[in-house]
Amino acid sequence: MVKIRLKRTGRKKLPIYQIVAADARSPRDGKFLEVIGHYQPTAKPHAVTIKKDRVAYWMQTGAQPTDTVRSLIRSTGLLYEMRLKKMGRSEEEIVSEMEKWQARQTERRQKRLVVKSRRRQAKKEAEGKAAGAEA
């Protein structure tokens, strides 16, 4: 059975992962069939590059992505695109749906940033009040 999984590279405390297609019996950093992407979790925001055509090929031949790789693939929109193709949508429909999907994802990221900044500001205000009450 072929798995699509992460192979750790990089150095100590600075991981960089290759997204590879590998036999399920091989060790994590052992033999693999093909490199199909990269993932840098330490970059802000996380950097993910995936060869979409090769991921689609391996998944169509029966390769199973691990949970982490599945979430990375989902974040690039590839799973949604593959689902639309499987449903029999035309190329124009797929392109328009993917543009809508990208817009929704951008909007969600912006909302998350706003919420995060509000939480930071509230935390700073609470710390300021606590410091003022102690003095």
UniProtKB/Swiss-Prot annotation:
SUPFAM superfamilies: Ribosomal protein S16 (SSF54565). It comes from the Bacteria. Residues 106-135 are annotated as: Disordered. Keywords: Ribonucleoprotein, Ribosomal protein. InterPro entries: Ribosomal_bS16, Ribosomal_bS16_CS, Ribosomal_bS16_dom_sf. GO terms for cellular component: cytoplasm; small ribosomal subunit. One of its GO terms (molecular function) is structural constituent of ribosome. Belongs to the bacterial ribosomal protein bS16 family. The gene is rpsP. The keyword Repressor does not apply. PANTHER family: 30S RIBOSOMAL PROTEIN S16, SMALL RIBOSOMAL SUBUNIT PROTEIN BS16M. This is Small ribosomal subunit protein bS16. GO terms for biological process: translation. Residues 109-122 have a biased composition (Basic residues). It holds the Pfam family Ribosomal_S16. The lineage of its organism: Bacteria, Pseudomonadati, Chlorobiota, Chlorobiia, Chlorobiales.
